[in-house]
Amino acid sequence: MAKKDELGRRGESVAAHWLEAHGYVLIGRNWRIRSGEIDIIARTGNITVFVEVKTRATTHYGHPLEAITPEKAARLRRLTAEWCRTYGPLPGALRVDAIGVLNAWSANPEIHHLPGIV
């Protein structure tokens, strides 16, 4: 596995643990179809949350959340709709969030949660 992939997987694990620590219940990870992937699917209260995780080792190339372009947000919206078509929407609202993780390998990674990006 390439270092970039390892860093991304580590960031997703950090984000998943952070969500659980903040009361979210994980219901899926790395849901893939031909057109893309949803990193984390979770529930908080009556909201199903679809989470895109972006991880960077440093900010030399910008903050991780800067990687969420309008095109990526549109793709996430389409993936969320496809997930709902596949599994049926759960009761309550839907939301798409982003989590940026910096220094994922450190004992204290920086986590930035941005709810409702689409």
UniProtKB/Swiss-Prot annotation:
This is UPF0102 protein Lxx14785. It holds the Pfam family UPF0102. It comes from the Bacteria. HAMAP family: UPF0102. It comes from Leifsonia xyli subsp. xyli (strain CTCB07). Belongs to the UPF0102 family. Signal peptide: none annotated. One of its GO terms (molecular function) is nucleic acid binding. SUPFAM superfamilies: Restriction endonuclease-like (SSF52980). InterPro entries: Restrct_endonuc-II-like (IPR011335), tRNA_endonuc-like_dom_sf (IPR011856), UPF0102_YraN-like (IPR003509). PANTHER family: UPF0102 PROTEIN YRAN.
